[in-house]
Amino acid sequence: DNIYNKDIQIVLFFFKQKSYVYFCKNFTMDFFSTSKTLGILGGGQLGKMLLYTTRKWDIKTSVLDPNENAPAKLACDNFTVGDLTDFQAVYDFGKKVDVLTIEIEKVNVKALEKLELEGVKVYPQPHVLKTIQNKCLQKKFFKSHNIPTASFEEFETLDQVKEAIIKGELSFPFVWKSAEMGYDGYGVTIVQSNKEIESLDIGPCLIEELVTFEKELSV
């Protein structure tokens, strides 16, 4: 809500695609201060980088992470050890902050839904996070919004994948992706032969065509 002190007038001038901010009347060094607390689920490297900015803006932060020595621990105002997938841990943590965000998508969405209903501002919103957490839902989202993506097929079990190969419905090579719990390359495998299939997780997944590309971008 108000990230600037009320007694500071801000005048923005746009000239040649540059923004000039002029602070008038009672200029102070804490003009970025806020009385609200930002909660961050996850205290890894990304959380630590986020805290670089919150400290510059004098934003009070609380971090929840299962690792008592998480990278973000030293840079936040309050640190709590807790399971990000545990409903009660996430809910109790969220009740102590004004705005809640994530550093990693592996968090308890049901707790976030309850917090949002009770007035806590959650970003990204829980319904968006549900899509982010599941690669099958992601692909369906791309397809329904006409966003170009590699062709794919969903499978509930690894046995179904094997059966599709036997029937000639799938051919090597292809990309196997775990529907959930995949991150930083984990849960993604380029499969070249039947032998490599045996090392894959047996749960829900999607099989994606192997495409050539020049550059990979993460947004």
Predicted features, each with a name:
Residues 131-218:
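Active-site nucleotide/adenylate-binding loops and adjacent lid/helix of ATP-dependent enzymes
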Residues 10, 18-19, 26:
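Polybasic, lysine-rich low-complexity intrinsically disordered segments
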Residues 25-128, 132-133, 137:
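ATP-binding N-terminal substructure of ATP-dependent carboxylate-amine bond-forming enzymes
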Residues 1-7, 26:
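Intrinsic-disorder-associated, low-complexity terminal segments enriched in Asp/Asn/His/Tyr and depleted
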